[in-house]
Amino acid sequence: MPTWTEYIFQKKLGHTPSPGDVVEVVPDLVGFHDLTGYHVLEVLESMGKVEVFDKERVVVAFDHLSPPPTQRAAEIMVYIRKHVKALELPHFYDVGGGILHQIILEKYAMPEYVIFAADSHTNTAGAVGAFAHGMGATDIAAALKLGKTWVVIPAPFRVDMKGEFPPGVMGKDVALHLLKQFGAEGFNGYSVEVFVEIPKAFPMDDRATVANMSTEMGADALMFIPDVVTVDYLQRERGVSYKPPDLQPGRYVDKYVVELSKLEPLVAAPYSVDNVKAVREVEGVEVDQVFIGSCTNGRLSDFEIAARILRRGRVKSRCIAIPASYTIFRKALELGYIDILTKAGCVVTYGTCGPCLGGHFGVAGPGEVVVSTSNRNFKGRMGHPDSKVYLANPATAAAAALEGKIVDPRPYLL
């Protein structure tokens, strides 16, 4: 029987490809944002008439430098808006709409889809079982123009999630655990297929975090095999019905088992995503700023757990909290999470990448220590090259903001 990767491409191609095959594929969705869109559209212009193969399959979002913090960023947005209007693209999200990957996940991605976008964290949509893969501007421009592009079929790698999360452990810790085990390039050339033993013990928000950070693992894609959680999510969020196919497990080049109950809160210490340590190993490190958000951990459950901790008092470190989309912002507002965070002293704004890439809304200064729920912590990632970034789950981040230092979040959840 086919693996999930083989099943998807079998349906697309009419035959079962082998790992390493170079194939042309018609994508179900193509996306770009403000930081990559300028280059995508420049390439399209160089190809002659600016046109897209199917405007219903194109998603555009302003997220990286939104709202524009510089004159150049504003000029780029004007340029992209002009083309969006001329092309009559209906799925355009201007300032405040949210981060491209979250928008694709919550509004468009479906199991079995093939999704290409001009950003490395396109993998996020694998949370619902889509083959989602980041590409460069030239390849995305070709996909937009021609309605197809090439892809190298990756080798399938199986990961089994056994058991349930203990308190204070989240999808971020699973991602960091995998990075510790396999390294930052451990899944190069692989499509990681994740099977969950107890589906409802591994919610969609946590799946999205793991899929998102598969980029840091080097994976071509990471897909959670659709199950009852996938079906419920699509029905609840979009009113869309989906029935997973009845597939027997295929053949994998390798496999790995994650025992969820044995995990504890983890961090990736400076300056590498695979420099992973238990929170208890770095307890007491003083923190200047905390960032809760990004396409990795800016979802509703992330804000819920942060609010549970931050209702205890005022923050001792600067805390910037940014929901990943307008939809999440509105829900967090209605549920009172944003009220709790602002009363605790956090700065909260709408969906934008913000400080994740060191662009704006909280760039780190020289010597500053940041605890961030985002996905990268290399030198200078969030600002000054002399700053230090610890990647953590939202509970650990919120507890660090509350105490002004890295602490184990579990006592704050009792």
Swiss-Prot record:
InterPro entries: Acnase/IPM_dHydase_lsu_aba_1/3, Acoase/IPM_deHydtase_lsu_aba, Aconitase_4Fe-4S_BS, Aconitase_4Fe-4S_dom, HAcnase/IPMdehydase_lsu_prok, Homoacnase/IPMdehydase_lsu, IPM_dehydratase_rel_enz. Pathway: Amino-acid biosynthesis; L-leucine biosynthesis; L-leucine from 3-methyl-2-oxobutanoate: step 2/4. Keywords: 4Fe-4S, Amino-acid biosynthesis, Branched-chain amino acid biosynthesis, Iron, Iron-sulfur, Leucine biosynthesis, Lyase, Metal-binding. One of its GO terms (molecular function) is 4 iron, 4 sulfur cluster binding. It is an enzyme of class 4 (lyase). The keyword rRNA processing does not apply. Its cofactor is [4Fe-4S] cluster. It catalyses: (2R,3S)-3-isopropylmalate = (2S)-2-isopropylmalate. GO terms for biological process: L-leucine biosynthetic process. SUPFAM superfamilies: Aconitase iron-sulfur domain. Its EC number is 4.2.1.33. It holds the Pfam family Aconitase. Binds 1 [4Fe-4S] cluster per subunit. Transmembrane segments: none annotated. It comes from the Archaea. Heterodimer of LeuC and LeuD. HAMAP family: LeuC_type2. This is 3-isopropylmalate dehydratase large subunit. It comes from Pyrobaculum islandicum (strain DSM 4184 / JCM 9189 / GEO3).
